[in-house]
Protein backbone atom coordinates (compact mmCIF):
# COMPACT_ATOMS: atom_id res chain seq x y z
CA UNK A 1 0.00 0.00 0.00
CA UNK A 2 1.34 3.41 -0.93
CA UNK A 3 2.87 5.57 1.78
CA UNK A 4 2.07 8.73 -0.23
CA UNK A 5 -1.51 9.93 -0.29
CA UNK A 6 -3.39 8.50 -3.23
CA UNK A 7 -6.13 6.04 -4.06
CA UNK A 8 -3.96 3.20 -2.70
CA UNK A 9 -3.03 5.01 0.52
CA UNK A 10 -4.15 3.81 3.94
CA UNK A 11 -6.38 6.86 4.43
CA UNK A 12 -8.19 6.30 1.14
CA UNK A 13 -8.58 2.59 1.91
CA UNK A 14 -10.06 3.47 5.31
CA UNK A 15 -12.59 5.83 3.71
CA UNK A 16 -13.63 3.18 1.19
CA UNK A 17 -13.90 0.58 3.97
CA UNK A 18 -16.21 2.87 5.96
CA UNK A 19 -18.34 3.47 2.87
CA UNK A 20 -18.55 -0.26 2.20
CA UNK A 21 -19.42 -1.02 5.82
CA UNK A 22 -22.20 1.56 5.76
CA UNK A 23 -23.50 0.15 2.48
CA UNK A 24 -23.55 -3.40 3.81
CA UNK A 25 -25.16 -2.27 7.07
CA UNK A 26 -27.87 -0.27 5.32
CA UNK A 27 -28.68 -3.14 2.97
CA UNK A 28 -28.70 -5.44 5.99
CA UNK A 29 -31.26 -3.19 7.67
CA UNK A 30 -33.60 -3.66 4.72
CA UNK A 31 -33.01 -7.41 4.74
CA UNK A 32 -33.73 -7.59 8.47
CA UNK A 33 -37.04 -5.76 8.13
CA UNK A 34 -38.36 -7.20 4.89
CA UNK A 35 -36.88 -10.70 4.88
CA UNK A 36 -35.81 -11.94 8.32
CA UNK A 37 -38.60 -10.41 10.42
CA UNK A 38 -41.16 -11.32 7.77
CA UNK A 39 -40.12 -14.98 8.22
CA UNK A 40 -40.06 -14.85 12.02
CA UNK A 41 -42.56 -17.35 13.46
CA UNK A 42 -41.45 -17.44 17.09
CA UNK A 43 -43.29 -16.22 20.20
CA UNK A 44 -44.36 -12.58 20.62
CA UNK A 45 -43.97 -11.93 16.89
CA UNK A 46 -45.99 -8.71 16.76
CA UNK A 47 -44.33 -7.27 19.86
CA UNK A 48 -40.84 -8.15 18.63
CA UNK A 49 -41.45 -6.69 15.18
CA UNK A 50 -42.76 -3.52 16.80
CA UNK A 51 -39.72 -3.17 19.05
CA UNK A 52 -37.31 -3.70 16.15
CA UNK A 53 -39.29 -1.29 13.96
CA UNK A 54 -38.93 1.37 16.66
CA UNK A 55 -35.15 0.90 17.02
CA UNK A 56 -34.14 0.20 13.42
CA UNK A 57 -34.56 3.80 12.14
CA UNK A 58 -31.93 4.99 14.63
CA UNK A 59 -29.43 2.53 13.17
CA UNK A 60 -30.32 3.56 9.62
CA UNK A 61 -29.96 7.22 10.59
CA UNK A 62 -26.56 6.60 12.19
CA UNK A 63 -25.28 4.61 9.22
CA UNK A 64 -26.58 7.28 6.85
CA UNK A 65 -24.81 10.05 8.75
CA UNK A 66 -21.53 8.13 8.75
CA UNK A 67 -21.98 7.37 5.04
CA UNK A 68 -22.60 11.06 4.30
CA UNK A 69 -19.53 12.13 6.29
CA UNK A 70 -17.39 9.48 4.58
CA UNK A 71 -18.67 10.62 1.18
CA UNK A 72 -17.46 14.16 1.89
CA UNK A 73 -14.19 12.76 3.24
CA UNK A 74 -13.84 10.91 -0.04
CA UNK A 75 -14.24 14.20 -1.92
CA UNK A 76 -11.39 15.75 0.08
CA UNK A 77 -9.26 12.64 -0.40
CA UNK A 78 -9.92 12.62 -4.14
CA UNK A 79 -8.96 16.29 -4.31
CA UNK A 80 -5.63 15.56 -2.63
CA UNK A 81 -5.04 12.51 -4.84
CA UNK A 82 -5.71 14.47 -8.04
CA UNK A 83 -4.26 17.91 -7.26
CA UNK A 84 -1.75 17.11 -4.51
CA UNK A 85 -1.65 18.03 -0.85
CA UNK A 86 -0.21 21.48 -1.60
CA UNK A 87 -3.27 22.54 -3.64
CA UNK A 88 -5.99 24.12 -1.49
CA UNK A 89 -9.66 23.51 -2.14
CA UNK A 90 -10.90 26.08 -4.62
CA UNK A 91 -13.92 26.76 -6.77
CA UNK A 92 -12.07 25.70 -9.93
CA UNK A 93 -10.62 22.50 -8.49
CA UNK A 94 -13.96 21.44 -6.97
CA UNK A 95 -15.76 22.27 -10.21
CA UNK A 96 -13.29 20.07 -12.09
CA UNK A 97 -13.95 17.15 -9.76
CA UNK A 98 -17.69 17.54 -9.30
CA UNK A 99 -18.93 18.82 -12.66
CA UNK A 100 -16.37 17.81 -15.29
CA UNK A 101 -15.78 14.14 -14.58
CA UNK A 102 -17.64 10.85 -14.30
CA UNK A 103 -16.25 10.58 -10.76
CA UNK A 104 -18.10 13.78 -9.85
CA UNK A 105 -21.42 12.52 -11.17
CA UNK A 106 -21.00 9.36 -9.13
CA UNK A 107 -20.10 11.44 -6.07
CA UNK A 108 -23.27 13.51 -6.43
CA UNK A 109 -25.34 10.33 -6.63
CA UNK A 110 -23.73 8.95 -3.45
CA UNK A 111 -24.02 12.23 -1.53
CA UNK A 112 -27.66 12.76 -2.53
CA UNK A 113 -28.61 9.19 -1.67
CA UNK A 114 -26.88 9.36 1.73
CA UNK A 115 -28.59 12.68 2.49
CA UNK A 116 -32.00 11.21 1.63
CA UNK A 117 -31.31 8.25 3.94
CA UNK A 118 -30.56 10.60 6.84
CA UNK A 119 -33.60 12.74 6.01
CA UNK A 120 -36.08 9.87 5.82
CA UNK A 121 -34.72 7.71 8.67
CA UNK A 122 -36.38 9.64 11.56
CA UNK A 123 -39.68 9.48 9.67
CA UNK A 124 -39.55 5.68 9.45
CA UNK A 125 -40.88 5.39 13.01
CA UNK A 126 -44.30 6.24 11.57
CA UNK A 127 -44.08 2.87 9.79
CA UNK A 128 -45.51 4.18 6.52
CA UNK A 129 -44.89 2.14 3.39
CA UNK A 130 -43.98 5.27 1.41
CA UNK A 131 -41.21 6.18 3.85
CA UNK A 132 -39.68 2.73 3.72
CA UNK A 133 -39.86 2.68 -0.08
CA UNK A 134 -38.01 6.01 -0.22
CA UNK A 135 -35.41 4.68 2.22
CA UNK A 136 -34.97 1.48 0.21
CA UNK A 137 -34.58 3.41 -3.06
CA UNK A 138 -32.00 5.75 -1.50
CA UNK A 139 -30.04 2.86 0.01
CA UNK A 140 -30.00 0.99 -3.30
CA UNK A 141 -28.83 4.12 -5.13
CA UNK A 142 -26.09 4.65 -2.56
CA UNK A 143 -25.04 1.02 -2.98
CA UNK A 144 -25.05 1.36 -6.78
CA UNK A 145 -22.83 4.44 -6.58
CA UNK A 146 -19.98 2.49 -4.97
CA UNK A 147 -18.96 0.33 -7.98
CA UNK A 148 -19.48 3.24 -10.39
CA UNK A 149 -16.09 4.70 -9.45
CA UNK A 150 -14.15 1.43 -9.30
CA UNK A 151 -13.08 -1.39 -11.62
CA UNK A 152 -16.64 -2.17 -12.85
CA UNK A 153 -16.95 1.30 -14.38
CA UNK A 154 -13.87 0.62 -16.52
CA UNK A 155 -14.97 -2.84 -17.68
CA UNK A 156 -15.72 -3.63 -21.34
CA UNK A 157 -19.43 -3.80 -20.45
CA UNK A 158 -19.64 -1.31 -17.58
CA UNK A 159 -23.41 -1.49 -17.09
CA UNK A 160 -23.30 -5.26 -16.66
CA UNK A 161 -20.25 -5.02 -14.41
CA UNK A 162 -21.85 -2.37 -12.18
CA UNK A 163 -25.12 -4.33 -11.99
CA UNK A 164 -23.23 -7.50 -11.06
CA UNK A 165 -21.26 -5.64 -8.40
CA UNK A 166 -24.51 -4.20 -7.02
CA UNK A 167 -25.91 -7.72 -6.73
CA UNK A 168 -22.64 -8.68 -5.02
CA UNK A 169 -23.20 -5.89 -2.49
CA UNK A 170 -26.82 -6.96 -1.98
CA UNK A 171 -25.58 -10.48 -1.27
CA UNK A 172 -23.12 -9.11 1.29
CA UNK A 173 -25.79 -6.92 2.86
CA UNK A 174 -28.35 -9.70 3.01
CA UNK A 175 -25.87 -12.04 4.67
CA UNK A 176 -23.33 -10.04 6.68
CA UNK A 177 -25.34 -6.83 7.05
CA UNK A 178 -28.45 -8.57 8.32
CA UNK A 179 -26.28 -10.71 10.64
CA UNK A 180 -24.87 -7.50 12.11
CA UNK A 181 -28.36 -6.05 12.56
CA UNK A 182 -29.55 -9.35 14.02
CA UNK A 183 -26.67 -9.43 16.52
CA UNK A 184 -26.67 -5.75 17.47
CA UNK A 185 -30.38 -4.95 17.26
CA UNK A 186 -32.87 -7.79 16.89
CA UNK A 187 -31.44 -10.20 19.48
CA UNK A 188 -31.10 -7.46 22.16
CA UNK A 189 -34.70 -6.47 21.33
CA UNK A 190 -35.78 -10.08 21.84
CA UNK A 191 -34.10 -10.10 25.25
CA UNK A 192 -35.71 -6.82 26.27
CA UNK A 193 -39.30 -8.02 25.89
CA UNK A 194 -41.33 -9.08 28.91
CA UNK A 195 -40.90 -12.75 29.76
CA UNK A 196 -38.58 -15.24 31.42
CA UNK A 197 -35.25 -16.49 30.16
CA UNK A 198 -36.89 -19.46 28.41
CA UNK A 199 -39.15 -17.12 26.43
CA UNK A 200 -36.13 -14.99 25.53
CA UNK A 201 -34.24 -18.06 24.31
CA UNK A 202 -37.23 -19.12 22.23
CA UNK A 203 -37.47 -15.68 20.62
CA UNK A 204 -33.76 -15.68 19.79
CA UNK A 205 -34.03 -19.19 18.36
CA UNK A 206 -36.94 -18.06 16.20
CA UNK A 207 -34.92 -15.12 14.90
CA UNK A 208 -31.94 -17.30 13.99
CA UNK A 209 -34.21 -19.85 12.31
CA UNK A 210 -35.71 -17.04 10.25
CA UNK A 211 -32.26 -15.70 9.39
CA UNK A 212 -30.40 -18.91 8.48
CA UNK A 213 -32.19 -19.80 5.18
CA UNK A 214 -32.00 -16.19 3.99
CA UNK A 215 -28.29 -16.07 4.83
CA UNK A 216 -27.74 -19.13 2.62
CA UNK A 217 -29.52 -17.46 -0.31
CA UNK A 218 -27.70 -14.15 0.06
CA UNK A 219 -24.30 -15.80 0.58
CA UNK A 220 -24.92 -17.85 -2.57
CA UNK A 221 -25.66 -14.60 -4.45
CA UNK A 222 -22.46 -13.14 -3.02
CA UNK A 223 -20.45 -16.18 -4.12
CA UNK A 224 -21.90 -16.46 -7.64
CA UNK A 225 -21.49 -12.78 -8.46
CA UNK A 226 -18.04 -12.75 -6.88
CA UNK A 227 -16.97 -15.70 -9.01
CA UNK A 228 -18.26 -14.00 -12.14
CA UNK A 229 -16.49 -10.72 -11.34
CA UNK A 230 -13.26 -12.56 -10.52
CA UNK A 231 -13.26 -14.39 -13.84
CA UNK A 232 -14.23 -11.22 -15.71
CA UNK A 233 -11.45 -9.24 -14.02
CA UNK A 234 -8.66 -11.83 -14.19
CA UNK A 235 -9.62 -14.10 -17.09
CA UNK A 236 -8.23 -17.22 -15.43
CA UNK A 237 -6.74 -18.72 -12.29
CA UNK A 238 -3.04 -17.97 -12.86
CA UNK A 239 -3.38 -14.23 -12.03
CA UNK A 240 -4.56 -15.23 -8.55
CA UNK A 241 -0.93 -15.81 -7.59
CA UNK A 242 0.83 -13.88 -10.37
CA UNK A 243 -0.59 -10.41 -9.66
CA UNK A 244 -0.99 -8.17 -6.63
CA UNK A 245 -4.70 -7.94 -7.35
CA UNK A 246 -5.01 -11.72 -7.42
CA UNK A 247 -3.05 -12.24 -4.21
CA UNK A 248 -5.13 -9.61 -2.42
CA UNK A 249 -8.26 -11.31 -3.72
CA UNK A 250 -7.05 -14.64 -2.30
CA UNK A 251 -6.66 -12.97 1.11
CA UNK A 252 -10.22 -11.66 0.83
CA UNK A 253 -11.49 -15.12 -0.11
CA UNK A 254 -9.68 -16.56 2.89
CA UNK A 255 -11.51 -14.20 5.26
CA UNK A 256 -14.82 -14.95 3.53
CA UNK A 257 -14.14 -18.67 3.92
CA UNK A 258 -13.71 -18.20 7.67
CA UNK A 259 -16.97 -16.25 7.82
CA UNK A 260 -18.79 -18.91 5.77
CA UNK A 261 -17.37 -21.75 7.88
CA UNK A 262 -18.48 -19.99 11.06
CA UNK A 263 -21.93 -19.48 9.59
CA UNK A 264 -22.11 -23.17 8.74
CA UNK A 265 -21.07 -23.98 12.32
CA UNK A 266 -23.88 -21.76 13.63
CA UNK A 267 -26.37 -23.49 11.36
CA UNK A 268 -25.30 -27.07 12.13
CA UNK A 269 -24.20 -26.89 15.76
CA UNK A 270 -25.58 -23.77 17.44
CA UNK A 271 -29.04 -23.47 15.90
CA UNK A 272 -30.33 -26.91 17.08
CA UNK A 273 -29.65 -26.05 20.76
CA UNK A 274 -30.74 -22.40 20.77
CA UNK A 275 -33.89 -23.16 22.75
CA UNK A 276 -31.66 -23.82 25.75
CA UNK A 277 -31.34 -20.79 28.08
CA UNK A 278 -27.52 -20.49 27.94
CA UNK A 279 -27.04 -21.08 24.22
CA UNK A 280 -27.16 -17.34 23.53
CA UNK A 281 -23.58 -16.80 24.71
CA UNK A 282 -22.37 -19.49 22.32
CA UNK A 283 -24.24 -17.84 19.46
CA UNK A 284 -22.84 -14.42 20.38
CA UNK A 285 -19.24 -15.67 20.28
CA UNK A 286 -19.57 -17.42 16.94
CA UNK A 287 -21.50 -14.50 15.41
CA UNK A 288 -18.77 -12.06 16.43
CA UNK A 289 -16.15 -14.31 14.81
CA UNK A 290 -18.24 -14.44 11.62
CA UNK A 291 -18.68 -10.66 11.62
CA UNK A 292 -14.98 -10.08 12.35
CA UNK A 293 -13.90 -12.25 9.43
CA UNK A 294 -16.42 -10.50 7.18
CA UNK A 295 -15.08 -7.10 8.27
CA UNK A 296 -11.53 -8.15 7.33
CA UNK A 297 -12.87 -9.29 3.94
CA UNK A 298 -14.50 -5.88 3.54
CA UNK A 299 -11.21 -4.12 4.28
CA UNK A 300 -9.53 -6.36 1.69
CA UNK A 301 -12.19 -5.26 -0.79
CA UNK A 302 -11.37 -1.62 -0.06
CA UNK A 303 -7.76 -2.38 -0.99
CA UNK A 304 -8.81 -4.23 -4.16
CA UNK A 305 -10.79 -1.27 -5.49
CA UNK A 306 -7.59 0.70 -6.16
CA UNK A 307 -5.30 -2.24 -6.97
CA UNK A 308 -4.42 -2.53 -10.68
CA UNK A 309 -5.63 -5.77 -12.25
CA UNK A 310 -3.35 -8.16 -14.12
CA UNK A 311 -4.13 -6.65 -17.52
CA UNK A 312 -3.70 -3.00 -16.49
Regions found by a protein language model. Give the residues of each.
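Polytopic transmembrane helical bundles with strong interfacial aromatic enrichment
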Residues: 1-312
